[in-house]
């Protein structure tokens, strides 16, 4: 696959009001898992609406290392899976992104073996993969760890009832992909309910799997003997849509976000409404208007359908210039308040207390050199720069390229004063 060009920094100046129309890409958090799921069936699977981002390129490289042929052009990814897949995910590829752990499920399901490096990617504190391994053990898999690798074997995966101690998205995905070729019925209780889980289940069912209940807390999978490659369109990226909502919320204006799904963002849209934004669905997306300086709100991150932890950096950025005091509570990843130190450099008034932050909005931020610590925090700093006097230079912009296809160009099309440094 061709690499995605990366910029060292993104330069932002105070902007607004924003206006115009922007289209969201397919969801990163779905596309990566669908690419992994293609391993379940030899032959050619075709995915449409695949974003041109670094993480997709890296997943393609990982699949190529396993023997697949991967092409990505014009938003369509073609994955040719051989009969003989190499069941290993090496460190130099896996350490780039945590999502690569989801090759474990399909490799076990189809081949009965896997050797996967302990994953890397964004560091949000303690994010153990124990739930993945415990769940797969319930199906009959056995694991050892050696020299930084998880070595897995499963002579005969057998359906079982698996109760997740937390509705982990990754664990749910790995269990789904492992169990579709297992003997008997698997039931996942306390399963993750995200739209990306439902998208994966739709893809698997098109391949010939028998999955029901995806999008609810109980998913049932009846194992089948074999699957076939298919064609599928990736669901829209709700986190990218939230990024544009935060941008217009901070800068003011009126925009249309094509492709966005209001029904995938209910809780966030309710909170934005409390802040004073107006958001309503259109025939093919969302219309959003921000009348000016927004009011404060209290937000707690929760598993879907609650406010997603991926939205949290954008909410913090918006509250940093709101008219009043807001409180954000992070219940998913305790180490995810990494935007705060950079926003403080921009003049924000934020106080952290454990897994809570208290944000007293200021009238305007001050442009400053800052660093993107991860994908969403980096994008949130770009959005914050729209409300900062002077110039904001967001360094380590390669993180942003991991999750966004042309964020700079799309914000510029709405009237933002932004470019690559």
Question: Predicted segments — roles?
Answer:
Residues 1-421:
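Short, structured segments at the rim of ligand-binding sites
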């Amino acid at each position: 696959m061709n690499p995605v060009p990366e910029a060292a920094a993104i330069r932002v100046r105070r902007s607004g009001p924003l206006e115009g129309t922007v289209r969201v890409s397919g969801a990163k958090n779905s596309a990566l898992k669908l690419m992994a799921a293609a391993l379940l069936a030899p032959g050619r699977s075709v995915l449409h609406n695949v974003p041109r981002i670094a993480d997709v390129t890296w997943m393609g490289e990982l699949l190529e290392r396993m023997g697949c042929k991967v092409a990505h052009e014009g938003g369509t990814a073609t994955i040719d899976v051989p009969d003989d897949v190499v069941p290993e995910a090496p460190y130099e590829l896996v350490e780039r992104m945590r999502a690569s752990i989801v090759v474990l499920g399909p490799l076990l399901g189809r081949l009965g073996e896997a050797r996967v490096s302990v994953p890397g990617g964004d560091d949000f504190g303690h994010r153990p993969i124990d739930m993945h391994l415990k769940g797969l053990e319930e199906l009959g898999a056995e694991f050892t760890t050696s020299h930084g690798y998880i070595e897995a074997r499963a002579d005969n995966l057998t359906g079982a009832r698996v109760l997740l101690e937390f509705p982990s998205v990754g664990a749910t995905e790995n269990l789904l992909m492992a169990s579709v070729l297992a003997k008997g019925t698997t039931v996942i209780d306390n399963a993750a309910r995200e739209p990306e889980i439902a998208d994966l289940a739709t893809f698997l069912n098109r391949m010939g799997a028998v999955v029901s209940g995806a999008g609810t807390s109980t998913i049932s999978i009846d194992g089948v003997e074999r699957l076939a490659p298919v064609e599928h369109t990736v669901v829209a990226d709700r986190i990218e849509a939230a990024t544009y909502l935060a941008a217009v919320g901070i800068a003011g204006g009126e925009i249309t976000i094509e492709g966005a799904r209001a029904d995938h963002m209910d809780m966030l849209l309710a909170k934005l409404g409390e802040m004073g934004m107006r958001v309503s669905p259109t025939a093919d997306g969302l219309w959003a208007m921000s009348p000016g300086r927004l009011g404060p709100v209290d937000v707690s991150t929760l598993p879907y359908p609650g406010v997603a932890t991926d939205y949290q950096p954008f909410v913090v950025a918006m509250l940093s210039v709101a008219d009043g005091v807001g409180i954000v509570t992070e219940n998913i990843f305790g180490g995810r308040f990494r935007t705060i130190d950079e926003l403080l450099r921009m003049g924000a008034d934020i106080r952290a207390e454990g897994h809570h932050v208290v944000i007293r909005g200021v009238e305007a931020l001050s442009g400053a050199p800052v660093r993107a610590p991860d994908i969403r925090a980096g994008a949130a700093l770009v959005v914050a720069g729209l409300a900062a006097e002077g110039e904001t230079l967001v360094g380590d912009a390669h993180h942003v390229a991991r999750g966004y296809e042309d964020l700079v160009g799309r914000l510029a099309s709405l009237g933002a004063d932004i470019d690559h440094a």
